[in-house]
């Protein structure tokens, strides 16, 4: 983080630390490599499918927390924190950290976000 932006980053990290906990998401890259070897025709797709699978898992956990009225947000401080996380929790070297989800009480509603119009990003083809 550039020095001029660090105060904002520090405040954000403090808000995560004030939560009840953080869920860490990992992908076992040995499994991905094994599937690449077993199904060589699709080898280049397995890292992509791995990313998609972790995205689905992250979304499912977020939805489950939201349904329980627990606030959460998804963060990606990789690779900055990878070594520290692995050392702190004795994470196997073949596990790739893919995301962090701090969770806790909902202190305020989420701020509104601007999104691209659905008509510009979604197509129905008949």
Regions found by a protein language model. Name each.
Residues 6-11, 85-87, 109:
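Glycine-rich, charged/polar anion/phosphate-binding loops
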Residues 19-22, 68, 99:
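Generic beta-strand structural signal
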Residues 29, 38-87:
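Small-aliphatic-rich amphipathic alpha-helix that forms the alpha element of a beta-alpha
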Residues 35, 85, 119-122:
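Generic structural signal of hydrophobic/aromatic residues within well-ordered alpha-helices
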Residues 90-93:
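Short, hinge-like loop/turn segments at secondary-structure boundaries
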């Amino acid at each position: 983080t550039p020095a001029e932006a660090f105060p904002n980053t520090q405040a954000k990290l403090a808000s995560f630390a004030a939560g009840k906990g953080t869920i860490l998401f990992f992908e076992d890259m040995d499994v991905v490599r094994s599937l690449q070897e077993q199904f060589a025709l699709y080898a280049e797709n397995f890292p992509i499918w791995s990313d998609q699978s972790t995205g689905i898992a992250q979304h499912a956990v977020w939805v489950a927390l939201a349904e329980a009225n627990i606030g959460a947000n998804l963060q990606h401080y990789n690779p900055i924190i990878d070594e520290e996380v692995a050392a702190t929790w004795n994470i196997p070297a073949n596990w790739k950290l893919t995301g962090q989800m701090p969770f806790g009480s909902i202190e305020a509603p989420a701020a509104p976000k601007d999104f691209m119009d659905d008509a510009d990003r979604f197509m129905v083809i008949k």
